[in-house]
Amino acid sequence: SSAEGIMRKLVDEAGLEDAFEIDSAGILSYHQGELPDSRMRAHAARRGYNLVHRSRPVRTDDFFNFDLIIGMDDRNIDDLKDRAPSPNEYPKIRRMTDYCTQFTHADHVPDPYYGGADGFEHVLDLLEDASAGLLATCLAQDS
């Protein structure tokens, strides 16, 4: 949901909120209904993001309702493919870091929850970069 909050802000700032449907979901349902980690919310708030989305699990309908399904790492990608209703949906499944234009060496968004403040800042840096690249890619494909 950090990625959702960042992407939503970028889309809103571009005046494109009516052109995009942005949502986030988790692979596991044990955080269902919870807000993002309070440390992530605090770090994000300092950058102007309001992370208020409550967690929900990925649903089969997501593969029909969204043009892209984005995972944060290879394990997410594998889990998403396992949940896809058919291999026909695989092309919708992408890795978030594939959209990075500054952190081009990054191959995943790490889990910051067991480290210190630097981990949260690094994840936000990656997500800002990838979200900007994702928005640019979507706009280029739409033109």
Task: Specify the residue positions occupied by each region the protein language model found.
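Conserved active-site segments centered on acidic
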Residues: 1-66, 136-143
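Acidic pyrophosphate-coordinating catalytic loop
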Residues: 29-34, 62, 72, 85, ...
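Phosphate-binding/catalytic loops
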Residues: 68, 74-143
